[in-house]
Amino acid sequence: MAAAAAGGLPGKGHDISLAALRRHDPYISRIVDVASQVALYTFGHRANEWEKTGVEGTLFVYTRSASPKHGFTIMNRLSMENRTEPITKDLDFQLQNPFLLYRNGTLSIYGIWFYDKEECQRIAKLMKNLTQSEQLKACHGAGSSPVTLSSGEGQEVDILQMLTKAKDEYTKCKTCSEPKQMTNSSAICDNPKLIKPVPVRPSSSQRLQGPAPSKTSDPEPQHLSLTALFGKQDKAPCQETVKPSRTFAHHHHHHHQQQQETRPVHHGVACSLSCEEPRKLSLPVEKQLCPAIQKLMLGSPGLHPLPQHPEQWSCKSGSPSPAGGILPGPVQLGSPWNGRVAHCTQSTCRGHKLLEQLQGAPGAVHKYNPCAPTGPAVATQVAPGQSVAQSQLVYFSGPLQPPAPGHQALRKEQGALPAQAVSLSGSQESSPTVLPTQELLRKLQVVHQEQQAAPRPALAARFPVSAQGSGTEKPLEAWVSKTASMEKQAPLLQSTCAPLRETDNGLMALGGQELPAASSNLLLPLQNWESSTVASRPLTRLQLQEALLNLIQNDDNFLSIIYEAYLFSVTQAAMRTT
């Protein structure tokens, strides 16, 4: 079999061996030589001795249709692991009969033991010839085409030579791979196919100054400071503060819709319009006020402002206030219960006269009252089932039980005092019953003089602060703070709002009797305790401030009344000092 394989003659055993080899390597084309019995050993570098690998069997030398062109394989009889080694230029063979030693490209040393020494010499000679031919091809193929010609098999491609050549060319070109600097040559400037970069934002200043490598064409972003940012928005809060009032003053005819939006729970209390944005009032608006209003807002020695927090008061509808049995609500001048309030100084009376002018100013409250009636007159006919907040005149009802005899005498003394029932008008045009300013001031002066001439100077009448911005009534702080000692003796006071209608002699309450002609402008006590009562939320300081500011800016008549009251108080003070 070995002779037949060596001579290249066809045989049945040769075909079986070739088929078995092609199962492991399909590129094997033919068998060149065969050794019947060999064993493979490896040299151990640590032990410095030969070690058996467990591979022994028949050795086949063959040619391949692909690179590498030659190789040998030991078909192992002991196991399924065969030993295959390609024949390349890196192999180094040495004959030591009956051993054939060789070293491969990984510098591993192996020894093949041959059972037949003649086979050992023949295979050793063949291995050396094939290795030398591979080395010659590698030397000549480095400068020639990677395509090589095999003996008698046509034109084939050497993959290893192609990879080697590509590596060499890459190594040579790596030294000069850096691009050269572009110059202003004519070849570059005149080339139409050359794509030149175009600046994104060219500026004329950069063209004149020349290219600056450290600066970009994009402008630097502007950094806004907090001063510049808030300086531009100083006027915005002022405009936003005035807008809600003008909007509701323009649409005051749609008061039913505003009632549903502003007072979802309490039907007798109208929420303030300025409570939506109470903090939008800026400081420059306060600086534009006249001295009289600043004195009124900051609090003069005679003025006692109400608490700014409405939570300090009892505001449940239909129940009297716990402090002395007093219900919050505006108090008209000349009330028979004025004798129960504490003593006030002359400056206090002058300050309250200013506030009474605020109440009597036409069109001063309706702009902030979405719940006011839309009729053309001040006192219009209102259905009994409507909201009590729509009424325009406030009365104090009589006591629940007969008072003490001492207090009855007090009532007789105070009942003789003249009074003026000042109604809060809806607008300037729809208030024909509002008294002129001079007549109102004259009557206020008469009331004040008669109160000073009363036999009980220690209990002079004090006019509490009352304002109805946004359709709400303020409670009486002075009565709560000054009448703690008289709570057990004083009867409960009830503030009721009765709708009015016009008569020939003046105003008449719908639910009571018609007022006499001589006393149509006096405040009368009502005996109907079962009528509906309203406890409203007081205005905060910011809400009152916004209401006054809006009236000063938009209503000239309001400002004129305040100024006349201010002049009158100054002249009265000068007369008293002289």
Swiss-Prot record:
It comes from the Eukaryota. Pfam families: DCP1, mRNA_decap_C. May play a role in the degradation of mRNAs, both in normal mRNA turnover and in nonsense-mediated mRNA decay. May remove the 7-methyl guanine cap structure from mRNA molecules, yielding a 5'-phosphorylated mRNA fragment and 7m-GDP. Belongs to the DCP1 family. InterPro entries: Dcp1, mRNA_decap_C, PH-like_dom_sf. It is found in: Cytoplasm; Nucleus. It catalyses: a 5'-end (N(7)-methyl 5'-triphosphoguanosine)-ribonucleoside in mRNA + H2O = N(7)-methyl-GDP + a 5'-end phospho-ribonucleoside in mRNA + 2 H(+). Its EC number is 3.6.1.62. Signal peptide: none annotated. It is an enzyme of class 3 (hydrolase). The modification Phosphoserine is found at S144, S145, S274, S335. Residues 248-257 have a biased composition (Basic residues). This is mRNA-decapping enzyme 1B. One of its GO terms (molecular function) is enzyme activator activity. The modification Phosphothreonine is found at T380. The gene is Dcp1b. Interacts with DCP1A. The modification N-acetylalanine is found at A2. Residues 187-222, 246-265 are annotated as: Disordered. Keywords: Acetylation, Cytoplasm, Hydrolase, Nonsense-mediated mRNA decay, Nucleus, Phosphoprotein. Its main location: cytoplasm. GO terms for cellular component: nucleus; P-body. Gene3D superfamilies: 6.10.140.2030, Pleckstrin-homology domain (PH domain)/Phosphotyrosine-binding domain (PTB).
